[in-house]
Amino acid sequence: MGYFVGLPLGGAAEKDCQVRFGKNMTFQVETRAPHLPAEWALQSGIQLTWPHAGTDWTYMLDEVQECFVAIAHEIAARETLLIVTPEPDEVKKQILGRVNMENVRFLKCETNDTWARDHGAITLLDADGVSLLDFKFNGWGLKFASDKDNLITRRAVESEVM
């Protein structure tokens, strides 16, 4: 049997959050207050925004795409992979026979860059379930174009791949 500790989270009332310590001092946070899931929390999939000639990787595109194939292989071996790319047919040729295609979904969408952490949906959990927030990335203070990347989440939700 684990221990329960009340813990206010982000100004939440003590009753809104419980921390359970297990036998080996592992812990699990149970909360009804809005929060971002931990990086180790269960997830429905991972998004990769695929490199192409219009991204910063042009000078070493072949090498970077090979790296993305290796990343895609590892992800799709374990869970759903969403690949965002303006060229899904080309990406399919690159990964066919090298990646578990049963776990791969594609979203055809123009992109500026590959950094999904900058433009991907933000998941918010609360008592009502899961919400996806459509974060607007400003390209590091307008240093880089991000207009196409800022459309990815909306298009993924509209096409029901997310």
Segments and roles (model prediction):
Residues 1-2, 25:
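Universal eukaryotic N-terminal targeting presequences
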Residues 3-4, 21:
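Aromatic (phenylalanine/tyrosine) cluster motif
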Residues 7-10:
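Intrinsic, low-complexity polybasic segments
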Residues 21-162:
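The feature marks the mature, well-folded catalytic cores of soluble enzymes
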